[in-house]
Amino acid sequence: MWRMWKILDYRRTVVLAHVGMAVLALLIHFILLSTESFNWLEGNPYG
C-alpha cells in the first residue's frame, strides 16, 4: 500500500474522493426530485 501513496498524492486522492461522493449524492437527489413519486418538495406527503 505504501508504494501506491508514493505514486499518488494522498491529500489530492482524499479530496477527489470527497468531491466525487458529493457529486454523486447531488446527482441522486436531483434524479429523485425529477421523478413524480419521489419528489418530496411537491409530492403528496401522505403517499
Swiss-Prot record:
A Gene Ontology cellular-component term: plasma membrane
Residues annotated for a bacteriochlorophyll binding in this entry: 29
Spans traversing the lipid bilayer: 13-33
Top-rank taxon, per record: Bacteria
Positions in the Periplasmic compartment: 34-47
Cited Pfam families: LHC
Annotated SUPFAM superfamilies: Light-harvesting complex subunits
InterPro entries noted in UniProt: Antenna_a/b, Antenna_alpha, Antenna_alpha_CS, Light-harvesting_complex
First-listed, main subcellular location of the protein, grouped into a coarse class: membrane
NCBIfam families: pufA_517_ASD
Annotated family: Belongs to the antenna complex alpha subunit family.
Protein name: Light-harvesting protein B800/850/890 alpha-2 chain
